[in-house]
Amino acid sequence: MTEFDLHAYMTRVGQQARAASRAMARASTADKNRALLTIAAAIRRDADKLKAVNARDVERARTNGQDAAFIDRLTLSDKAIATMAAGLEQIAALADPIGEISNMKFRPTGIQVGQMRVPLGVIGIIYESRPNVTIDAAALCLKSGNSTILRGGSEAIESNTALAALVAEGLAAAGLPSEAVQVIETTDRAAVGRLITMTEYVDVIVPRGGKSLIARLMEEARVPMIKHLDGICHVYIDDDADLEKAVRVCDNAKTQRYAPCNTMETLLVSREIAAKALPPLCRIYQEKGVELRVCPATRATLEAAGFSGLVDATEEDWRLEYLAPVLAIRTVDGLDAAIAHINTYGSAHTDSIITENYTTGMRFLREVDSASVMINASTRFADGFEYGLGAEIGISNDKLHARGPVGLEGLTSLKYVVFGHGEIRT
């Protein structure tokens, strides 16, 4: 595709998406739900076909030398397929936010002022090796009355194309415009450059991918973005922690899956409880093959308990998102030091405290400056499906518009509506 042809193609996609967004904004809840449920049924019906198509993408990725974390994100397992279908049904069951009027106020002038929830318009989704994003993005944009332009990675092209066909089937069944969900058909990277600068057609970009992709888009995009750059998540074990809870939560936060952005990457332990908390937990980590990168105080505690095979942590380790069986561990001087560490080195994604002290826990919630902050729970819960959003289109660690897992409401905005009886301003 020549540069001229690409520009013309992307312009056509943008124009069609803008036109479809107007139709989607007035689509009924019943029609949107009909489309979602049809897609869910089609995914279950074609599960074996989807796995066969996905297997070809996975085999190519392995041949190209992609690592285990990449392959994990790319693979459509039985569980992943079931989760996609369940997510569609959960989104269909959610209340439709579009048209909801809130914050009504009666003014002394006689007018009534409120806010109405409306779609954002056209949402561009750029993602790499996660074919499930095709469904999550289409579903959330559809239910929230938006149209969407999907640009998946070339490594998942067959999986994305197969899933997009099922989305088209659902739209047709509900009488909704096929252009409401469009997949960019070219793998030319210049298409991304055009998509992120089409301010006349695209209202927001949501990137789902690695750090290099997000960094590039932050430099080049003219369209606003909902994004997060890193998932450097922490769990802090407080002086007043229940040790059984601490071991269970911290084990899950790190080892349930290594690839997701809500996996714990740094464990912080209060010096007062380190000798009791670290040995049983680190024994589990080493049994599961997790490399432990430790500060000097943590090394001393673990070596006194008979541990070996530890790696000295560097300053860089506190800033790393490993997405692998590697964990940084730091012993800190209590709550103040833990909060300071998280706010200095963290990525404002998700952080958790293990404590039985209510005051300590509430202070952690207030002072840790992250999109999701937890007490006695695994960071792995920072997910749209687990939060009851049905699915998420992404996670934002920005502070404007949307923060944390972005579900339906994150894809809408509020406009002011005024009701009068002929009032004039004097």
Curated annotation (Swiss-Prot):
Q: Which Gene3D superfamilies match?
A: Aldehyde Dehydrogenase, Chain A, domain 1, Aldehyde Dehydrogenase, Chain A, domain 2
First-listed, main subcellular location of the protein, grouped into a coarse class: cytoplasm
Q: What is its EC number?
A: 1.2.1.41
Where does the UniProt annotation locate this protein? Cytoplasm
Pfam families attached to this UniProt entry: Aldedh
User: What are the GO BP annotations of this UniProt entry?
Assistant: L-proline biosynthetic process
Keywords (alphabetical) are: Amino-acid biosynthesis, Cytoplasm, NADP, Oxidoreductase, Proline biosynthesis
Please give the Gene Ontology molecular function terms for this protein: glutamate-5-semialdehyde dehydrogenase activity; NADP binding
**Protein's UniProt keywords contain NAD:** no
What InterPro entries does UniProt report for this protein, alphabetically? Ald_DH/histidinol_DH (IPR016161), Ald_DH_C (IPR016163), Ald_DH_N (IPR016162), Aldehyde_DH_dom (IPR015590), G-glutamylP_reductase_CS (IPR020593), Glu-5-SA_DH (IPR012134), GPR_dom (IPR000965)
Looking up PROSITE patterns in the UniProt record yields: PROA
In which pathway is this protein known to take part?
Answer: Amino-acid biosynthesis; L-proline biosynthesis; L-glutamate 5-semialdehyde from L-glutamate: step 2/2
Any one cellular component term from GO for this entry?
Answer: cytoplasm
Q: Which domain of life is it from?
A: Bacteria
Reaction catalysis annotation: L-glutamate 5-semialdehyde + phosphate + NADP(+) = L-glutamyl 5-phosphate + NADPH + H(+)
Q: What does this protein do?
A: Catalyzes the NADPH-dependent reduction of L-glutamate 5-phosphate into L-glutamate 5-semialdehyde and phosphate. The product spontaneously undergoes cyclization to form 1-pyrroline-5-carboxylate.
The entry sums up its family as follows: Belongs to the gamma-glutamyl phosphate reductase family.
**What NCBIfam families is this protein classified in?**
PRK00197.1, proA
- Tell me the protein's name: Gamma-glutamyl phosphate reductase
User: Which species does the entry assign this protein to?
Assistant: Cupriavidus metallidurans (strain ATCC 43123 / DSM 2839 / NBRC 102507 / CH34)
Q: Which gene encodes it?
A: proA
